[in-house]
Amino acid sequence: MPRRAASPTPSENEVDIAGALFNNDSDFEDNSSKHHTKKGAVTNSGLDLDFNDLLGNGDDGLPSFNGEGDDDEAFIASLTRSSQRKSSNIQGKSVKKGGGFQAMGLNAHLLRAITRKGFSVPTPIQRKAIPLILERKDVVGMARTGSGKTAAFVIPMIERLKGHSPRVGSRALIMSPSRELALQTLKVVKELGRGTDLKTVLLVGGDSLEEQFGMMASNPDIIIATPGRFLHLKVEMNLSLASIKYVVFDEADRLFEMGFATELTEILHALPPSRQTLLFSATLPSSLVEFARAGLQEPSLVRLDAETKVSPDLESAFFAVKGGEKEGALLHLLHDVIKVPLGPPEGTKEESDELQARKRKREYRPNPKEKPTEYSTIIFTATKHHVEYIANLLKLAGFAVSYVYGSLDQTARLIQVDNFRRGRTHILVVTDVAARGIDMPALANVINYDFPSQPKIFVHRVGRTARAGQRGWAYGLVRQSDVPYLLDLQLFLGRKLIIGHDQKNPSFAADVVVGTLKRDGVDVNIEWVEKALKESADLKALKGVAAKAEKLYMKTRNSASSQSAKRAREVTQSRGWTQLHPLFGEEAAEAQAARDDLLSRINRFKPQETIFELGPKGKSSRNKAAEVVRNMRSRFKERKTTNDEDDEDVDMEDAEGKPDGEETNAFEDFEDEEEEGEAEEAEEAEAKEDPYADDSDSEMEVTVSSSMHTKKKGGPVNFQDPEIFMSYTPRTTSLAEEKAYGVHSGGYSGNSFVEAARDATMDLTNDESAKNFGLPTKSKMRWDKRHSKYVAVANDEDGSKGAKMIRGESGVKIAASFKSGRFDRWRKDNRLGKLPTIGETEKSQLIRNFGAQPGQPRYKHKMEKAPKDADKFRDDYHVRKKRVAEAKEKRIGKYKDGEGSKRELKTATDIRKARAVAEKKREKNARPAKRQKR
């Protein structure tokens, strides 16, 4: 009987039962092809059919037919269940509920790389963003630090590009604001791109331009670059970006700030309009107006963790310090709070370059040192001068320190970060260059030595710790001038402010807790710092430079909100501002309070007698000076201050209101009454003047910056009626949060709507020396005090400041050094003709010569030739003579054995070779050997 044809109408789940009924073309099937399982299920044609359920076996194992004719339905149901069980296993792993990477339709190589990377379940940002990106939509993604944003745009990029294209032209561009972030992105791309032949290049400042010329000539698929160096290569090589299909702006809010305005304007102008654009950052505003220049087309906004902002596993503590005590407070924090051990970490040995060269290359494995420890600490400072000063101070104190800042040499930056990652140092001192996107695996503590001027900078700084479920601590040193920024941060985070011991057992993960450090620990370290400054002239010079840099930093940093500045006075004048931090416990707080009370009593002590009245008492010991002082005291009464009068009033009230035997503390009772009075007045004012009392507490929690102004007697009356006035600022949204998330409004200077509207005017005529309505025209020149001459104001606005500039393709001014002709010289030196353009087939010669991936060995010639001898009859005689002298000094080429080209003493090998050469010459000339004379 021939096999029956498959049914043309598939079942609901597209399961063909004919394949299960007839496995072979013959009716006689060998029983050996069936594999019996333990429970009676027979595996046939790759499907597991449970015949016990199918036949309805009873407890005795015998089939029980019910005679109702539903055997076919039971068979089909069993077949469907087995098919579903088989399809649920992909790549050997079951699909997680809610959708895993397997459910996103990724290819097998990429799934294998994701598994090797250690990802099992996608994070929320990956689950939301990857499907949208695979649909080729523009996406703006925001999630807190450490949530897997890099993999969220790398995975769909690899899925879309799939493999290397022989057609010339890069297809993906990833822009990063810093070199370290670009290096980390390259690492993720290489790990997730295993199994593909995609070519990736890294273009950052500090590396050789010639090597990067070769990388770009080898036709890479993916470019990871910083804006400055990429624009330099684009202008120098006259690159075309028409083939770019996938553009990612990592840490987009930092990229679109004014620092990269010129570079991004030129790059965005060269990108094709049909590209897919992605923006990712941990701090993004809800409005996309500020990213209009990115050319987004109907973007999808994925904004997660906007309420949490920082990791829930992060605990924070803020310490009130004085300006001159920051160094001592930092040392006290490291010695007594974090308890960082002195000297290099245990088990780390410095390997020599020779041992590292002989070291066999192996596959990278996570270093056990690259795990968060209780000692690994990163310290953020304001400028690079602070980095150098603090790093040298900590090294002098005995700590193992690494340091990184923006202008540090690229190789030095890599070495310093690698030492910290591998556990060779416990402390890393950095500027904000390391605040964004860099994954520091061995990091448990963050110290804000200089308090951040923007709340979103704080979010990026503390995001270096408490990642991947690990606990972490963030410490901050707060001076009196930093209190407004602390209050802005408190409004942005939406947390409760606890000062001193206002609340018992505060939550360091959910509140903003402020207090002081232990006085005795800080004083000891301050004395040590003063001694070190006296003994080390270099350290003293570094401190002077850091002080000058701090003055400039204070002038240029963003200003805090006016409401926070007003609240700062109340906060610093409160009693809790000088209390010990709750982190040290109640016993230490009581001891500190007793110590402060004793010191305050000693400070307020005034002797009853003057120095003129000292001496033996009695009639026999009369002193004219003492008599004069006594007469003056009896004639003039002591003037009482307002504080003394208040204290007396409080003492009188307490004496009247309490029984005789009870002790009183006038100072504490006075402060308690004052606080109660202020609280009652604040409640009454809030009840009278709050027009939004019906709104929820969560919505009004952080609207302090937009509160109504209180009416003052004799002042101008506010014309705004809260019932009918419609403001341009939203009522229920957090203004503090939106201002902090803003790209150009991270600070509070110049970001009001009125100022922006005033600057948005359009002038149609500007022929005369003045504008309409008598407004003066902005001067085009200004006086430069340093050079004592007038300079153009336009140079200050575009950043040129008198330097040579050229116009780019978009019309903006760029540095003339971007077009220096180095690429033409490089092409001439390598004997390369015209390079292939976009769309042409790549040349195999370029791939062989310059196609090595970053990190792979490049084969270069190492032969060194000595220059030719100087010729007196040539014009370049003196130049050649100088080059020959340099070659002799460096022992290059034929001068490698010394001043002359020959050794003074010949070895046996040299003598044997010389005899062989002489014998060859004799045979060639066919001359008989000379006879020796007798």
Curated annotation (Swiss-Prot):
Share an example GO biological-process annotation for this protein.
Answer: rRNA processing
List, as start-end ranges, the regions of compositional bias called Basic and acidic residues.
Answer: 864-926
Substrates-to-products reaction catalysed: ATP + H2O = ADP + phosphate + H(+)
Q: Where is the composition biased (Acidic residues)?
A: 644-654, 662-700
Which GO molecular-function terms appear in the entry? ATP binding; ATP hydrolysis activity; RNA binding; RNA helicase activity
User: What is a single cellular component term in the Gene Ontology annotation?
Assistant: nucleolus
Motif DEAD box: where in chain: 250-253
* Subcellular localization(s) per the UniProt record: Nucleus, Nucleolus
- Where does the record place the Helicase ATP-binding domain? 130-302
Checking InterPro entries in the record gives:
DBP10_C (IPR012541), DDX54/DBP10_DEAD-box_helicase (IPR033517), DEAD/DEAH_box_helicase_dom (IPR011545), DEAD_box_RNA_helicase (IPR050079), Helicase_ATP-bd (IPR014001), Helicase_C-like (IPR001650), P-loop_NTPase (IPR027417), RNA-helicase_DEAD-box_CS (IPR000629)
Q: What is its EC number?
A: 3.6.4.13
**Residue span of region Disordered:** 21-43, 343-370, 613-722, 851-934
Q: Where is this motif: Q motif?
A: 99-127
Assigned keywords, A-Z: ATP-binding, Helicase, Hydrolase, Nucleotide-binding, Nucleus, Ribosome biogenesis, RNA-binding, rRNA processing
The answer to keyword Chaperone applying to this record is no
**Domain Helicase C-terminal residue range list:** 359-513
What function does the entry list? ATP-binding RNA helicase involved in the biogenesis of 60S ribosomal subunits and is required for the normal formation of 25S and 5.8S rRNAs.
| Family classification | Belongs to the DEAD box helicase family. DDX54/DBP10 subfamily.
Q: What is known of its domains?
A: The Q motif is unique to and characteristic of the DEAD box family of RNA helicases and controls ATP binding and hydrolysis.
Q: What is this protein called?
A: ATP-dependent RNA helicase dbp-10
The species is: Neurospora crassa (strain ATCC 24698 / 74-OR23-1A / CBS 708.71 / DSM 1257 / FGSC 987)
Q: Which gene encodes it?
A: dbp-10
